[in-house]
Amino acid sequence: MSRFYFFFNLICLYLAIKSALSAELDTNDQKYADLRTTGRGESPDSTGPDSDTLRRDDGAEGLNKRAAAMWFGPRLGKRTIAADLHDDLVEEFDAEPLGYAGEPPQKLATELVQGAPYMVLLVTAKPRKPQPIFYHTTSPRLGRRDSVGENHQRPPFAPRLGRNLPFSPRLGRSYNGGYPLPFQFAY
């Protein structure tokens, strides 16, 4: 039965990803076509001094701006991204449809689910069995005294010594608190 759940979840996940990707590719077909023809996300008829330099930078013979900015070497941490390149990257990131635009991830997830024809809930946890209800009744602890609430004083001597009263060599002179003292302490 668990294999069935696994394959069902796998198929549902595949369908959800496929439908989400197909919906995104349909909306971006024009952008990807422009990217294939010009090398950038511009329309093919856009000409100007800027588009030629960008195509030359993105060509196979030279490094593009992104590759130049991501240089990992002995000066790691000392190289900074140029301000204009940083602005270009931020604009490109903001133009992406799946880019993070300051929205919470729950909103992005609901937008993806609303655009997809299927809704998938992955059930991976095993179903819980209901716990049996036990009615607990207290039973007396065998070998114990019945009166738990009373103060039981421990015997002053261990039973192996054979004594059952505290040793008092000066009988009559010890104060146990049972009678008042003839004198009072001044505090």
Curated annotation (Swiss-Prot):
Name of the gene encoding the protein in the UniProt record: PBAN
Upper taxonomic lineage: Eukaryota, Metazoa, Ecdysozoa, Arthropoda, Hexapoda
MF term (GO), any: myostimulatory hormone activity
Compartment annotation: Secreted
Maturation-removed propeptide residues: 23-64, 80-127, 174-187
Modified residue annotations for Leucine amide: L76, L142, L161, L171
Signal peptide (from-to): 1-22
Keyword Chaperone set for record: no
Coiled coil: none
Protein name: PBAN-type neuropeptides
Region (Disordered) residue spans: 34-58, 132-163
GO cellular component: extracellular region
Role, per record: A hormone that controls sex pheromone production in females and pheromone responsiveness in male. Also mediates visceral muscle contractile activity (myotropic activity).
The keyword Protein biosynthesis is annotated on this UniProt entry: no
A Gene Ontology biological process term: neuropeptide signaling pathway
Family: Belongs to the pyrokinin family.
Source species of the chain: Anopheles gambiae (African malaria mosquito)
Residue spans of biased composition, Basic and acidic residues class: 34-43, 143-153
Major location category of this protein: secreted
Keywords of this entry: Amidation, Cleavage on pair of basic residues, Hormone, Neuropeptide, Secreted, Signal
